[in-house]
Swiss-Prot record:
InterPro entries: AMOP_dom, DUF7658, Epithelial_Barrier/Signaling, F54D1_6-like_C, F54D1_6-like_Ig-like, F54D1_6-like_Ig-like_2, NIDO_dom
Stretches the record annotates as Disordered: 1394-1419
PROSITE patterns found in the cross-reference section: AMOP, NIDO
Protein name according to UniProt: Uncharacterized protein R09E10.5
Coiled-coil boundaries: none
Subcellular localization(s) per the UniProt record: Membrane
Xref: SMART domains: AMOP, NIDO
GO CC terms of this entry: extracellular space; membrane
Domain AMOP, first and last residues per copy: 648-829
A Pfam match: AMOP
UniProt keyword terms in alphabetical order: Glycoprotein, Membrane, Signal, Transmembrane, Transmembrane helix
Bilayer disposition of the protein: Single-pass type I membrane protein
GO biological process: cell-matrix adhesion
């Protein structure tokens, strides 16, 4: 046996000997009835040792790989008279196939289930784009297990039961007749006699007897689900509710003779078509029991046409071969020998067919390209998950690996020969990554790597993340409930011991025991910390604790039902931190996430967690506890809860201060966010600026996500659609940086708008917020962009987690958990006030060729072909941008398909009109993927109305609506069914495109339409860096283009780039409808050569369009995408949507552009015919009806009345003959014109007023804009406070009169407003009064003291002690022995004193003369004893 993916017949036989097929009753096999025996439970039994595989079972007529069929199983046989043309049966519900929905099918002996008329003229039945000329010839959709001309033998032994059998099986629950779980577990397949059932006993509402809806049908559907689960990656998610079983038994080639039939050259094969009740998923199982011929003529040679096993989408949507290998091309009979599920049975193949057919199971293809089926193909970037892979047929002795583009290698385990399970490592990236699957032998045995893709998403956007309830509840302190819900699907977990013990040979995916495992719920912390070993800051993931343990429910009831448990936030089962780390290191992890994974008994430290599911990022504050609370109990009393709340507040305050200091040490990134991506001033600008801003994926009405946590309260939030690009900001940045490239930063911008459409400002948040949970949360710039930054590995670069660590969690720490610290956060993260915002140039193409260009020209242009919609050549600062659109003639919807075969032929079903609509758009820029968005073909617009093809592969957006590719961001607004609204952003080019199919109408509410109309509207936004003025002023564009080296922007959306005049307010008139003044100029300049009708282009190639690319982006491929050209998507993008027969390109059917005068004349003529009573007397087939009836709208008078002077409405309504389309065209035109006028306006902003002291202050009005020119902001205080400072401001223009050409916008000058308490104000008043009184008293006393001092001074000056020598007093004069200078007398000259008295000296001292003070009384009498010799003054009068 050879190794690898290549298996020959011997290898398949050996595998079948090891794994015999699933048996009904005692054998697997078609009609191996074992009549009279005891039914047994079907299972995939192991072959006993020594048993020889024969391939026939115990029935000599039927093989082992067929399900029961025939009258005994309830089948009906196709009427022999209808074998060739086919017998149409009713399916009684819709089955999806290749994008269409079918409630019928046509069964033919020629080996197909058809859904349209099949052209079987000639010896060969041709289907598909390569072999049919549709629509001139039929190209029907069909499931063809063996397509070639065949017959049913009419005589002989093989003819005894030869024929085509069919039956329909429906689950009882579809008719409300189910009991219990409706799973007939352990049941048996009872034999039913068809002739014993009356039609009245069939399923309710189904009159045909081939319909079964009883316990046997339920059991059959359950068994088919097991088959799908064992062979298809992701098949466990499918629940079959209906099945169509068709069996071709003993058919022979169409012209074979009796000798061929007797030689056993007959074929027996079977198709089982499964779907669910919602018609969303559909699988086909093909069983080949015996293929005795590979062509339809004598002896099975191929002179008359080879038989094919093929799925055809119909109408040139593409084909898929059952086994596109070289052996199959040599002889299709090999299909009965090989298998896509070799572990089950030979000759069995499985496919998923609800949309473009994808092969399941394994393949023997060893070269070329074969699509891998991977489930899930949307994986969390944190890794540690498993995916199931269908690729090459597997050998258990081999080791298989899956290499991820530019990243690590995933190891894979063989589950069975068709499915491998690969364990993905952690991938520091997000977006689509190409994966390669092959044996580790690396092609030693001619194996080639199978190529597929996996989409890695950040945890914030992962649609398959672990459900832990309302995410916002995890960010509250205190949490509203300590018991939080957790939900998961048990089938997402398997027992790792079964897969790793080396003894899993007999393990089946459908076994319930495989899912019995103990699960641990772990909390993983994330931080960006300093690593001293590498000398850098890097991300770190650490398992902090295991919270609890759950038992994964593995009974059958939980196959589709989720398991619901609770998380006790007061309980921690096991910590992986030491006590010291719990009190210190734990608080360095600001954010974390849950991980649910099987318990690894060998992992004691939580460092080797097994693959599992992770949740969205959550706060870790519920793990913070004071030292006296150690999670010892399951509940907390009120005191403990209060202590924890206060502890969280205090710890949050400390962490807020730490973050404030930490962020302040980093680069001031506000200069980059505000100068390069300033927020739009109003929401309309943000809505139309598609190249630079997008709706917030978690906090906007478009995505309707419930995980918004930080900006609740805004009507809509928008964020920068890519990383902010910065430019050189050093010295000489005015001229020296003109030739420097912009570079990508890791910053992002978030702008939130209130219900009035104005920006919410962070300085006003403390003023407006009146309640703790009041929702006024403005957007703010991000140091770490939410979508991450390449290479997604370092600090600030990890998608989702870096922004929570650096921006979102500090908001909660400062604004939610701590008290009075929100201003600190907003000082570091001030919101943008649009002071540097410049509006983009906006254009729109809608309806039947109605254009509003990006430079404000308006016209209607119709011409089929592929046009250069926008082309920008590459420059030093900007990449090359290429956008092309395909315009096709819209079909005439008045054609009655019921006339097919009587009055009209096949090619006349699609008759074009003279109106062209946009059916596709292709975009790419330098270094990006090529994106193609197209409307789907008619009868294919049910589940998906559009195709989104990236890199030649069809992408789906119904699970995750935002996807990122190389240089391109794509997101859809899937509020309406069928992804009718698609947004494509070229990130570096900053050009955005909005593609809308049929105005995004809700077709379900339009009773006259079964599906959408099939036309695209395109809105484009071009950022101002290209120099296109949105107001249409082009007077100085040439000078600016030369001065600043700007690229030339041209295309169908800007047809006159060299024009020097423009218009701002001119409308659309009838003269602008397909005017000859510009039609041929646009065709010659922008039509891609080789497209459109013959003779359209009047110039030869090479004479014009020297500066325009001429390769058709819809039919060509980039070098890296050419390997996928063999996929059926190639037909979808390269083929026209409304392809017409060649006759409609010539003669009177050629396209004739309709001018405004022609439309008006047509409407007036048709209205006159409508109002002319003689017209009603004419027969229906008259010349008047033939000449005008097919051209006139149904009600021309209503067209003129409804549309009025709206030229766009008149044109669309008249040519498309649809009131809905006409009114929608009018509404879209008016709405875009109004929004565009608002969006291109230059708003002048003063910025928000920074309020430093917001306590007890209110803003009037509270939710007014408060930043635009003319705004008035008044600040008041509540009734308990008085306002201080300047409290009224106006935003206006300030002109420097010394430089009249320089001006700015700012608020009027004033002091900072603030509030003072009335009580404190009264206290200060009383203090002022008391202080005033005391001050007045003090002033009076001071005045009295001053005057008293003055008086005393004057009194002293009035005394003069100086005079004659006799009266001179020398008491204070220095004696001869003193060294100090003489002392002046203080009482003046006393020489005029009347007399002096000599005072007796103290006893024992020498008498010294003294100067006596004048006294107002008489001196002591001289006769007093002891007074002799004394001098005195007599002052008596």
């Amino acid at each position: 046996m050879r190794r690898g993916c290549r298996h020959h017949l011997a290898a398949v036989v050996l595998l079948i000997a090891t794994f015999p097929p699933l048996a009904y009753n005692q054998n697997i096999g078609g009609i191996n009835q074992n009549i009279g025996g005891t039914p047994q439970n079907p299972t995939i039994n192991q072959v006993s040792p020594g048993q020889i595989f024969s391939g026939t079972g115990n029935n000599p007529f039927y093989g082992v790989n067929l399900v029961p069929f025939g009258p005994e199983a309830g089948d009906l046989m196709v009427n022999p008279s209808m074998l060739t043309s086919g017998m149409t049966i009713d399916l009684y519900m819709f089955f999806p196939y290749y994008g269409g929905l079918y409630n019928y099918t046509t069964i033919s002996v020629n080996g197909y289930l058809g859904f349209a008329t099949v052209l079987d003229q000639g010896p060969t039945i041709n289907v598909g784009p390569e072999t049919t000329d549709w629509p001139r010839q039929e190209d029907p959709a069909m499931i063809a297990p063996y397509l070639c001309k065949q017959q049913v033998p009419q005589q002989g032994n093989p003819a005894r039961r030869a024929g085509v059998y069919y039956r329909l099986l429906l689950r009882q629950s579809l008719f409300g007749r189910e009991s219990n779980s409706n799973l007939n577990l352990g049941g048996t397949l009872q034999q039913n006699a068809f002739f014993g059932q009356q039609a009245s006993q069939a399923c309710p509402g189904t009159a045909d007897s081939y319909v079964r809806c009883d316990s046997n049908s339920d059991y059959f559907l359950d068994q088919m689900m097991i088959w799908v689960q064992e062979g298809v990656a992701g098949g466990a998610m499918f629940r079959a509710d209906a099945a169509v079983v068709v069996t071709w038994y003993n058919t022979a080639s169409a012209i074979s003779g009796r000798s061929d039939i007797d030689a056993g050259q007959t074929g027996t094969y079977q198709v089982i078509w499964l779907t669910d009740s919602t018609a969303r998923l559909s699988y086909v199982i093909i069983n080949y029991d015996r293929l005795g011929f590979d062509a339809q003529d004598f002896r099975g040679n191929s002179r008359s046409g080879r038989c094919r096993a093929v799925f055809n989408g119909g109408n040139h949507t593409g084909t898929v071969e059952v086994d596109p290998t070289q052996p199959y091309k040599n002889t299709p009979k090999v299909l009965a020998q090989r298998s896509g599920v070799p572990h089950m049975v030979r000759g069995r193949y499985m496919f998923r067919v609800d949309d473009v057919v994808r092969p399941a199971g394994c393949s023997n293809k060893t070269g070329g390209t074969y699509p891998i089926m991977i489930y899930p193909n949307i994986v969390n970037m944190l890794g540690d998950m498993t995916v199931d892979v269908n690729a090459c047929c597997l050998d258990r002795t081999q080791t298989y690996i899956m290499m991820i583009e530019e990243r690590e290698v995933a190891t894979c385990q063989v589950i069975n020969p068709a499915i491998a399970r690969c364990s993905l490592p952690r991938i520091y990236d997000w977006g689509t990554k190409t994966v390669y699957f092959q044996p580790e032998s690396r092609g030693a045995n001619d194996e080639k790597a199978f190529v597929g893709y996996i989409y890695f998403v950040p945890p914030t956007l992962d649609p398959m993340r672990l459900d832990i309830g309302n995410i916002y509840e995890w960010y509250k302190n205190p949490m509203t409930n300590y018991l939080m819900p957790i939900t998961w699907y048990p089938r997402n977990f398997t027992n790792p011991d079964i897969l790793t013990n080396g003894n899993n040979m007999g393990v089946r995916i459908s076994d319930d025991s495989m899912y019995g495992v103990q699960l641990g719920l772990y909390i993983v912390g994330y931080r960006e910390f300093k690593d001293d070993e590498i000398k850098k800051f890097r991300p770190e993931y650490r398992t902090l604790a295991r919270i609890t343990t759950y038992s994964n429910q593995n009974n059958a009831n939980y196959r589709w039902m989720p398991q619901e448990e609770v998380i006790n936030t007061n309980q921690v089962q096991q910590w992986y931190l030491t006590d010291w780390e719990r009190m210190h290191t734990l608080y360095t992890y600001r954010v974390g996430f849950f991980k649910l994974a099987p318990i690894n008994p060998n992992d004691a430290n939580g460092t080797q967690l097994l693959p599992g599911l992770v949740s969205a990022p959550i706060s870790l504050h519920w793990l913070w506890t004071p030292e006296n609370q150690q999670f010892a109990t399951l509940t907390l009393n009120q005191q403990d809860r209060d202590q924890r709340i206060e502890f969280v507040k205090e710890k949050s305050r400390e962490m807020c201060h730490d973050w404030y200091d930490e962020d302040g040490a980093l680069w001031n990134f506000i200069r980059d966010t505000e100068t390069n991506t300033s927020c739009p001033c109003i929401e309309t600008q943000a809505l139309l600026d598609l190249g630079r801003f997008m709706p917030h994926p978690r906090c906007s009405q478009m995505f309707r996500d419930i995980t918004c946590t930080t900006v609740i309260g805004s009507k809509n939030c928008y964020m920068s659609s890519s990383n902010i690009y910065s430019s050189y900001a050093g010295n000489g940045n005015t001229f020296n940086n003109m030739d420097t490239n912009r570079f990508m930063t890791h910053y992002g911008q978030v702008c939130c708008y209130d219900e009035s459409g104005y920006l919410m400002q962070t300085p006003y948040q403390p003023v407006i917020k009146t309640q703790r949970e009041y929702f006024y949360n403005p957007g703010y710039p991000l140091r770490a962009y939410e979508f991450g930054t390449a290479p997604y590995m370092g600090q600030f670069e990890v998608p989702g987690l870096s922004v929570f660590h650096n921006d979102y969690m500090p908001y909660f720490l400062c604004c939610k958990f701590a008290d009075f610290r929100c201003q600190m956060f907003y000082w570091r993260r001030p919101s943008s006030a649009c002071q540097q915002y410049q509006p983009p140039a906006i254009g729109h193409a809608q309806g039947a060729g109605v254009f509003q260009t990006i430079d404000n020209d308006k016209f209607i242009f119709n011409q089929p072909g592929v046009f250069n919609f926008l082309y920008i050549p590459q420059s030093v600062r900007t990449p090359e941008v290429r956008i092309q659109t395909r315009l096709e003639r819209y079909p005439n919807r008045k054609v009655d398909f019921g006339l097919l075969g009587r009055y009209i032929s096949q090619y006349e079903l699609v008759q074009p009109t003279n109106a062209t609509v946009i059916t596709g758009i292709a975009l790419e820029a330098t270094g990006t993927e090529r994106v193609i968005v197209m409307t789907r073909k008619d009868t294919r617009r049910f589940r998906y109305r559009t195709n989104i093809i990236v890199g030649n592969i069809l992408r789906y957006f119904d699970t995750i609506r935002l996807q990122r590719f190389r240089g391109v961001l794509i997101y859809v607004n899937n509020v309406e069914r069928g992804q009718p609204e698609i947004y494509v952003v070229l990130e570096e080019a900053q050009i955005g495109v909005k593609v809308t199919e049929s105005y995004a109408l809700d077709i379900d509410r339009l009773p006259n339409y079964q599906e959408s109309m099939g036309m695209l509207d395109i809105q484009i936004s071009v950022s101002p860096q290209y120099g296109v003025r949105p107001d249409g002023d082009k007077t100085q564009e040439t000078q600016y283009r030369q001065m600043y080296n700007l690229p030339r922007v041209s295309g169908l959306i800007r047809p006159y780039p060299d024009q020097t005049s423009g218009s701002l307010n001119e409308g659309l008139t009838l003269n602008d409808v397909n005017s000859d003044s510009y039609r041929q100029q646009i065709i010659n300049n922008y039509l891609v050569l080789g497209t459109g009708e013959p003779g359209t282009q009047q110039n030869q190639a090479g004479t014009l369009n020297q500066n325009m690319p001429q390769d058709n982006m819809f039919t060509t491929s980039r070098d890296e995408d050419k390997q996928f050209d063999v996929f059926p998507e190639a037909s979808m993008r390269s083929e026209p949507v409304y392809k017409t027969a060649p006759i409609f390109d010539t003669g009177s059917y050629r396209f004739v552009p309709q001018t405004g005068a022609m439309i008006l004349q047509l409407l007036n003529t048709c209205r006159d015919l409508q109002n002319n009573p003689n017209t009603d007397l004419q027969p229906y087939q008259s010349i008047a009806t033939l000449s005008y009836g097919l051209q006139c709208p149904d009600d021309p008078g209503q067209v003129l009345t409804e549309c009025g002077d709206s030229v766009a409405c008149l044109y669309d309504y008249a040519l498309l003959n649809s009131k809905v389309l006409g009114q929608e065209e009018q509404d879209a035109w008016n709405m875009f014109t109004t929004d565009r006028a608002l969006a291109i306006r230059q708003y002048n902003s003063c910025g928000a007023i920074n309020i430093e002291y917001p306590e007890y202050m209110m803003k009037t009005p509270a939710l007014s804009s408060g930043y635009l020119q003319g705004d008035v902001a008044r600040f008041e205080c509540y009734q308990s406070h008085w306002v201080k400072g300047d409290h009224e401001y106006k935003c206006g223009i300030v002109v420097d009169y010394n430089r009249p050409n320089e001006y700015r916008f700012e608020w009027n000058k004033g002091n900072q407003p603030w509030c003072r308490s009335r009580i404190k104000e009264n206290y200060f008043k009383w203090l002022a009064v008391i202080a005033g009184i005391v001050g007045i008293i003090i002033v009076i006393l001071l005045i009295f003291l001053v005057f008293w001092c003055i008086k005393r001074k004057k009194l002293q000056e009035s005394r003069n002690y100086s005079g004659t020598a006799a009266y001179s007093n020398n008491a204070f004069q220095n004696q001869t022995y003193e060294t100090k200078p003489s002392r002046a007398l203080s009482v003046g000259d006393l020489s005029t004193a009347p007399r002096t008295v000599a005072m007796p000296p103290p006893r024992g001292t020498t008498a010294t003369p003294m100067t006596l003070e004048p006294r107002g009384f008489s001196p002591v009498p001289s006769d007093v004893r002891g007074s002799q010799g004394m001098l005195g003054l007599n002052t008596s009068v």
